[in-house]
Amino acid sequence: MGEKDQLRPKVNVSSYIHFMLNFRNKFKEQQPNTYLGFKEFSRKCSEKWRSISKHEKAKYEALAELDKARYQQEMMNYIGKRRKRRKRDPKAPRKPPSSFLLFSRDHYAMLKQENPDWTVVQVAKAAGKMWSTTDEAEKKPYEQKAALMRAKYFEEQEAYRNQCQGRKGNFLESAKTSLKQ
């Protein structure tokens, strides 16, 4: 595997992680000879997290915000390698939408028209509820269309892979012939 960059800033942690680290230290101080497995400790920690007041949680949220600001500042000054997203080949076929997405596309405009002040998230949640309450007979056309699109995608994907392998083969053959000359 690749080597880790030792100079890369340490990633910021959430308020819950700050709480968990603090809880762990207090637990070790109070019961130094007691060992809890990860599962049991996590369970106790999450129970405690749910039971603490909003005021106490605010302390940890403030710590998380400070940590986030620290991380962002350090990343601005960081010169080393940054993680790069793998670039998608624009010629590669796109994955087809699911039956639910096809349903959502058809009903989005109607939901937005009925509720113009809703956000995209609210419309998506409403579409999800509509989908879950829709009977199988109404879902069937969307599922059939999705299946057709999926089959077409697999065909295109296979053709694309063959084309890519052909390009690699042609490249190797042209390289060999140029070396012979």
Curated annotation (Swiss-Prot):
Highest taxon of source: Eukaryota
A Pfam family reported for this protein in Swiss-Prot or TrEMBL: HMG_box
Regions recorded as binding DNA: 9-79, 93-161
Basic residues: bias regions: 80-89
PROSITE patterns assigned: HMG_BOX_2
Main location: nucleus
Gene Ontology annotations for the cellular component aspect, listed alphabetically: chromosome; nucleus
Start and end residues of each stretch annotated as Disordered: 80-100
Record protein name field: High mobility group protein B4
Annotated source species: Mus musculus (Mouse)
